Amino acid sequence: MTEMSFLSSEVLVGDLMSPFDQSGLGAEESLGLLDDYLEVAKHFKPHGFSSDKAKAGSSEWLAVDGLVSPSNNSKEDAFSGTDWMLEKMDLKEFDLDALLGIDDLETMPDDLLTTLDDTCDLFAPLVQETNKQPPQTVNPIGHLPESLTKPDQVAPFTFLQPLPLSPGVLSSTPDHSFSLELGSEVDITEGDRKPDYTAYVAMIPQCIKEEDTPSDNDSGICMSPESYLGSPQHSPSTRGSPNRSLPSPGVLCGSARPKPYDPPGEKMVAAKVKGEKLDKKLKKMEQNKTAATRYRQKKRAEQEALTGECKELEKKNEALKERADSLAKEIQYLKDLIEEVRKARGKKRVP
């Protein structure tokens, strides 16, 4: 009973000192602490420590850490003798789950060690990425020559190729739920990101091709993905990956952004409507032009008629003026004649 209480207290001390609470590392740390305490116990016997000294030393060491379990405050003295240090005990007899207090952990120590190794493998790329600059990333393909990794010999979008993974990485499938408990910065493996790389290769070249062809953009015609895949200017880096099969044109069209141009059917309908509107406008313009011409001709005819009438009236007026003048002269002549006759008769009467 004393041995069980001491073991439970020591295991609780190791559990509190573990860096990760209730994680897979707790079991390994607790096992390591038990082994260290057993090795320390072997050295106490040859030096001849009494039970009081062993009790004082152990209590003093536990007091320095400040992690003494409240179970040691019982009336029963767990350090009454040092005979328990020489006994060989089998840890398989004890229920580690009950001692550690981990009820939700159902895996065995071997599974925990395997999960811990996988977690360390996940942390290794993160440490390398933070220590190095972003452009100088580690090449995951070990058999490629260094000449292909130079920036002056790589195609503009070679970084979007899906990288072939090693069999070890593909075979190992770590528990993502366990890795997420250790920290939020854990990223997914390269195998899970492989479809994303393929999608990027399918989408980006089409955009680059559209930007590199100003003549097509000027004329309003965009090169189709089929013609781009069949063009001789296709990057050799994308051809050099035989393990990757290119997606179908339907997948390319579905993943690419929608084109800003209208379908040909809508273009034809719009052209017909525009042609009809233009014809109606031209007909209306012709009608307006004809009406204006007719109006001008009518006004010209009316003006000519008025001018002719005016000239005729002017001629009549001149004739009437001449006749009036002649009549006025005749009247004056007659007046003068009558006056002379009157004078002549008056002279005849006077004598």
UniProtKB/Swiss-Prot annotation:
Changing P156A: Increased stability in low oxygen conditions. Residues 305-341 are annotated as: Interaction with GABBR1. The BetaTrCP degron motif promotes binding to BTRC when phosphorylated. One of its GO terms (cellular component) is nucleoplasm. Residues 230-246 have a biased composition (Polar residues). Binds DNA as a homodimer and as a heterodimer. Heterodimer; heterodimerizes with CEBPB. Heterodimer; heterodimerizes with DDIT3/CHOP. Interacts with CEP290 (via an N-terminal region). Interacts with NEK6, DAPK2 (isoform 2) and ZIPK/DAPK3. Interacts (via its leucine zipper domain) with GABBR1 and GABBR2 (via their C-termini). Forms a heterodimer with TXLNG in osteoblasts. Interacts (via its DNA binding domain) with FOXO1 (C-terminal half); the interaction occurs in osteoblasts and regulates glucose homeostasis through suppression of beta-cell proliferation and a decrease in insulin production. The keyword RNA-binding does not apply. Residues 278-341 form the bZIP domain. Gene3D superfamilies: 1.20.5.170. The modification Phosphoserine is found at S215, S219, S224, S231, S235, S245, S248. Residues 306-334 are annotated as: Leucine-zipper. Changing P167A: Increased stability in low oxygen conditions. Ubiquitinated by SCF(BTRC) in response to mTORC1 signal, followed by proteasomal degradation and leading to down-regulate expression of SIRT4. Interaction with EP300/p300 inhibits ubiquitination by SCF(BTRC). Phosphorylation at Ser-245 by RPS6KA3/RSK2 in osteoblasts enhances transactivation activity and promotes osteoblast differentiation. Phosphorylated on the betaTrCP degron motif at Ser-219, followed by phosphorylation at Thr-213, Ser-224, Ser-231, Ser-235 and Ser-248, promoting interaction with BTRC and ubiquitination. Phosphorylation is promoted by mTORC1. Phosphorylation at Ser-215 by CK2 decreases its stability. Phosphorylated by NEK6. The modification Phosphothreonine is found at T213. It comes from Homo sapiens. It holds the Pfam family bZIP_1. Transcription factor that binds the cAMP response element (CRE) (consensus: 5'-GTGACGT[AC][AG]-3') and displays two biological functions, as regulator of metabolic and redox processes under normal cellular conditions, and as master transcription factor during integrated stress response (ISR). Binds to asymmetric CRE's as a heterodimer and to palindromic CRE's as a homodimer. Core effector of the ISR, which is required for adaptation to various stress such as endoplasmic reticulum (ER) stress, amino acid starvation, mitochondrial stress or oxidative stress. (Microbial infection) Binds to a Tax-responsive enhancer element in the long terminal repeat of HTLV-I. Belongs to the bZIP family. The modification 4-hydroxyproline is found at P236. This is Cyclic AMP-dependent transcription factor ATF-4. The gene is ATF4. The modification N6-acetyllysine is found at K311. It comes from the Eukaryota.
